[in-house]
Design a protein with these regions (language model features):
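Start-of-domain marker
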Residues: 30-97, 108-110
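N-terminal, helix-rich and Lys/Arg-enriched segments in bacterial and organellar proteins
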Residues: 12-13, 48
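Sec/Tat signal peptide C-region and signal peptidase I cleavage site
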Residues: 25-29
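Bacterial N-terminal signal peptides
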Residues: 14-24
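Acidic/His-rich structured neighborhood in mature extracellular/periplasmic domains
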Residues: 97-203
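Alpha-helical structural motif
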Residues: 14-15, 54, 148
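N-terminal secretory signal peptides that target proteins for export/translocation
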Residues: 1-11
């Protein structure tokens, strides 16, 4: 009987750990819903296969990355419309050129979704890509993950500024610093515009 009781307690303890991990991971990230539309109309059928997992990879990147331990209750909802303009081959490397629109949204009392005040149009997006390539959060510059980080910082900063005056400054600074690294990298396309954008919004 004691053995059965112990086994039952162990079962519930494991269940508790699973629940804690699932809900704990939700609690410490800044984005709670990410909707992605990948537009590949300009690509051939063969090139489209390269992006079979990209929508889900970007979604999971935003949902599971902790962009800051200091702000974990933002519950941001964003829509991303990513247009893949072209895919080119250079040796063993595949280069993707794209543009994107990112907007934040909010659930209304009636359950409908309303587009809020943040609207970012990104052009000159360029990054290397391959099938099965995972998007990993890193402090080093990476053309794809750094692009996603930049707009995460911008969206978080803009949201915090609605809470309190200049509350988002540290995140605008992170966007500026990331843009500096982008400008000095071998994948500098578009980063000068992002640098100017972050500084302009920060100083307004």
């Amino acid at each position: 009987m004691c053995k059965l009781s112990y086994m039952g307690q162990g079962k519930y303890f494991h269940l508790f750990l699973i629940v804690l991990l699932v809900f704990g991971s939700i609690g410490w990230t800044q984005f709670t819903e990410v909707n992605i539309n990948l537009d590949m109309r300009r690509l051939s059928e063969g090139d489209r296969q390269l992006f079979n997992f990209m929508e889900e990879d970007i979604k999971q990147y935003y949902l599971n990355t902790q962009f800051s331990p200091d702000v974990s209750d933002l519950e941001l909802i964003i829509d991303i419309h990513l247009v893949i303009e072209s895919v080119s081959q250079g040796g063993s490397q595949t280069t993707v050129n794209a543009q994107a629109i990112l907007v934040n949204k909010e659930v209304q009392y009636d359950g409908s979704m309303k587009t809020m005040d943040q609207y970012f149009y990104a052009k000159g997006i360029q990054f290397p890509y391959s099938i099965g390539r995972k998007i990993i959060y890193t402090s080093s510059f990476d053309p794809l993950s750094s692009f996603l980080d930049y707009y995460a910082f911008m969206l978080i900063a803009a949201e915090l500024d609605t809470w309190n005056y200049m509350m988002g400054t540290s995140f605008f600074n992170r966007a500026v610093e990331l843009s500096d690294r982008g400008k000095d990298s071998g994948w500098d396309q578009g980063w000068d515009d992002r640098w100017k954008k972050a500084r302009k919004i920060k100083n307004n």
